[in-house]
């Protein structure tokens, strides 16, 4: 019989800050892969605060997740745009930029795209 597992993003196994103190990603690891909680502050923009870490022109992570609070705008490399807010579930393919809208931090749970997100390239 399989055992239950309990982990908390309030006690993460790993935390990764983004540039200029504009947020962080907290991670717990499960058999299916890492689950992350991203918290980005007002003024955060992927191309300003994660691009220097990722060293790619746009975010190349696939994201599958749920917005807890705040708002974010995502623009794909091909120009497609979407905004996400509290209660929204989303799937975002690789090749995008994103930024926080408004004056509230953006908090997002992601169970697909966090394995290498905001992880310095060696």
Could you describe each region identified by the protein language model?
Residues 36, 80-82, 107:
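Short beta-strand segments
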């Amino acid at each position: 019989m399989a055992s239950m597992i309990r982990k908390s993003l309030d006690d993460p196994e790993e935390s990764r800050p983004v540039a200029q103190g504009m947020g962080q990603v907290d991670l717990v690891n499960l058999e299916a892969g890492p689950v992350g909680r991203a918290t980005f502050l007002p003024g955060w923009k992927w191309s300003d605060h994660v691009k220097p870490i990722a060293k790619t022109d746009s975010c190349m992570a696939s994201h599958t997740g749920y917005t807890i609070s705040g708002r974010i705008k995502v623009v794909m490399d091909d120009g497609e745009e979407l905004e996400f807010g509290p209660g929204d579930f989303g799937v975002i393919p690789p090749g995008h930029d994103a930024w926080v809208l408004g004056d509230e931090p953006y908090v997002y749970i992601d169970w697909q795209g966090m394995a290498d997100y905001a992880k310095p390239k060696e």
